[in-house]
Every structure is written in C-alpha cells, then in structure tokens.
C-alpha cells in the first residue's frame, strides 16, 4: 500500500500511463519472486531516480525514447548481476559500502522535496502560472502529521504502515474540504485495457547517444539503492538475502 502512491506518482510526473505502471509493477514483482525463488519478500514499484531523464526524453524525442532507455537500464542490471555472480558479493559490497549506499538513498528522497512542496502549496504544480492554495497546504500538513504520529506512537503492525494511514487521513480531510471529485470515477468503465505503447506499432525503437547518456549512468543510483534495500530487508527478516538466494538473483530480477 505504501508503494502504491509512489508507483502511481512517477508516471503522473513523467507523463506516462499510471495503469501501465501498476500492471507492469505487478508483473515485474511476480517475475522478481520467480527469479529469487520466492525467498525475498519485496514489491517492485516505480523508481524516482529516472524522473528527470524520462521527462526530458519524453519531451524531446517522445515516449519511445524513454521506453528504450528503460530497456537499456534492464540490460545494465543484468550485466551487473553477471558481474556480481562472477566476482562475488564481497567485491560489490566493497565498492558500494553502507556509507555510500545510505547517502545515495537520502539524496533520492531529498531531491524530490521541491516536487512535494510544490504539490502541497499550489493548486496545479505543473501549471505555468502557479496559484497558491492554503487548502492544499493544510491537507498536506494533516497528512504529514498523521504519518509522523503513527510512525512514532503506534506499535506492532500499525507502526509498519504509517504512510498508508497518513494517506487515508489526508484523503478523508480532502473529502471534508470538498476537493475530491468522484465524477471521473463514476464515468470510468468497470474494466478497461491499459493504454499500451507497442514498439514497431506506436513507435520505432531507436538507439541514440542521448538515450544512453541520460539513462544508463543513472542506473548506478537505483542499483546502490537496491543493495541497501537488501541489506536492510535482511536485517528486518533476520536473514542474509545477499548470500541466499544471492545478490545476483535479486539484481537480475529487479532489472
């Protein structure tokens, strides 16, 4: 539930289809569990690290360039997985120790602070003319307050889902402020096929230096984040997922 917001927010910010993001997120998670032999309890969602390059490629060259870039990143993950399998996990952990991985994860979150603030302060943070909204700011503060309270005060299972509780509280507050429009939900069909973008049908894949230079180098950021996530997840579960089923399997499945 906590990942749902992020998985939907990234395609909204980048101009992609949230329905496709949810579908591929689910399929990708199933593939990940298959590759890792079902031993790592993880869910794959959208990565915030690629927001800026995807927006740039989408605006300059179209959605096809962004999709080709995503495919290249998957190849990079596969190559790194082969490298880890060949040299061992100790070598990669020596190259990316916790003192490096930790700040990388922090930078990813902090780099999105301006986006969060803009969405909390303005009626439409993507508009050319920004209109300040005290209502949005109040709801954002209510959501943040509930999330912090639940994270600090609540115990057991509820302490694990403060983001979900915060989102729920913020949504209820939005209802009282009258800014929730149910009409799109009422008008939407019960079942609808997502708006797929098919290569060689909707666009012709082209490999350019622009795509390579904008997408491939950034792969080191989510790879570092992935390694940190595995170490933290292992601590929580009391297992060493880096050794079993192995970091190479986890990286390959993530890619």
Which sequence ranges carry the predicted segments?
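Membrane-embedded alpha-helical modules
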Residues: 59-184
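Short, non-helical or kinked segments that cap or interrupt transmembrane helices
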Residues: 16-23, 38-50, 92-101, 158-165
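Hydrophobic, membrane-embedded alpha-helices of multi-pass small-molecule transporters
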Residues: 1-3, 132-144, 161, 197-229, ...
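Generic transmembrane alpha-helix signature in multi-pass membrane proteins
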Residues: 8-14, 51-60, 90, 114, ...
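Membrane-embedded helical hairpins/re-entrant loop segments and their flanking transmembrane helices
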Residues: 15-33, 214-255
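Hydrophobic alpha-helical segments embedded in the membrane of multi-pass proteins
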Residues: 4-5, 20-30, 47-51, 75, ...
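N-terminal signal-anchor module of multipass membrane proteins
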Residues: 1-41, 49-59
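Juxtamembrane interface elements at the cytosolic ends of transmembrane helices
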Residues: 4-8, 143-150, 161, 172, ...
């Amino acid at each position: 539930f906590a990942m749902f917001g992020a998985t939907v927010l990234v395609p909204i910010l980048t101009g992609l289809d949230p329905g496709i993001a949810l579908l591929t997120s689910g399929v990708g998670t199933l593939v990940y569990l298959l590759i890792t032999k079902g031993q790592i309890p993880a869910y794959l969602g959208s990565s915030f690290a690629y927001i800026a390059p995807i927006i740039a490629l989408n605006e300059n060259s179209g959605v096809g360039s962004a999709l080709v870039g995503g495919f290249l990143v998957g190849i990079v993950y596969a190559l790194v997985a082969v490298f880890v399998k060949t040299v061992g996990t100790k070598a990669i952990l020596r190259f990316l120790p916790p003192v490096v991985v930790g700040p990388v994860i922090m930078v990813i979150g902090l780099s999105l602070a301006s986006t969060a603030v803009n969405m909390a302060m303005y009626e439409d943070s993507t508009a050319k003319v920004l209109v300040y909204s005290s209502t949005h700011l109040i709801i954002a503060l209510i959501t943040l307050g509930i999330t912090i309270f639940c994270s600090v005060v609540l115990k057991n299972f509820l302490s694990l889902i403060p983001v979900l509780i915060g989102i729920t509280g913020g949504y209820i507050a939005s209802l009282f402020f009258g800014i929730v429009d149910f009409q799109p939900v009422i008008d939407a069909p019960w079942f609808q096929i997502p708006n797929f973008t098919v290569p060689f049908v909707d666009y012709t894949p082209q490999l350019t230096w622009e795509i390579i230079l904008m997408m491939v180098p950034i792969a080191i950021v989510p790879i570092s984040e992935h390694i940190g996530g595995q170490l933290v997840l292992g601590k929580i579960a009391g297992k060493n997922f880096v050794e079993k089923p192995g970091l190479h399997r986890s990286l390959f499945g993530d890619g």
